[in-house]
């Protein structure tokens, strides 16, 4: 089973490299997207989990094969241009785990137009592992959406192929964001009918947080259906 922290370190070596314009990271696409009422989106490669329901396949599973390296400034310019054309007020990095390559992400948030809200969609592993990551967002126009993979550590392991104990880092990420006063919200992908245990954990992070869970939409692409059937989830 996967150790997401060790795998993040290996992935970082693969999907980032130092250049004259800072730490470059690999992206395979830049596009407008319909979510959040319209958002400029940069799709990166590589993730530290392997979710059975993940809509991204090849660029996530073969990050060495897909994408080109871009500096934070280049990504910011592309996102600003898409946002300007679509009249969007929000930007995000999707398609992968954006927290891999911390120096790149932090610089991207620093250089992008401050009027654009940066929505950080993350599985929270690295923010839960190291609380100083959450501190990087203090004073920034950032909103963090932590996507919880399952309602328990057992479901997390089944869905992500990672060791069950790493589920705690997802909850810890919420705690760290709460501690530093960062704007955040938990999202949840679950096939469980009972999420009471999770709700109790969230209430300990912040009273009322369990009422703010956003239930994620399952996009049943053929490869997703196949993966879920393989695990007897569907
Ligand atoms: S954490 Fe997100 S990008 Fe990574 S495998 Fe899971 S759904 Fe896909």
Regions found by a protein language model. Give the residues of each.
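Conserved alpha-helical substructure of the radical SAM core
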Residues: 58-91
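N-terminal [4Fe-4S]-dependent radical SAM core
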Residues: 1-48, 52, 56-64
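Short, conserved acidic/polar surface loops in the N-terminal third of protein domains
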Residues: 52-55, 63-66, 103-105, 130-132
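Conserved active-site and cofactor/substrate-binding residues in soluble primary-metabolism enzymes
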Residues: 42, 70, 103
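Pocket-edge positions in alpha/beta enzyme catalytic cores
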Residues: 39, 64-67, 97, 162
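C-terminal accessory extensions appended to soluble enzyme cores
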Residues: 210-234
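Conserved AdoMet/S-adenosylmethionine-binding subsite of the radical SAM
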Residues: 80-90, 95-213, 218
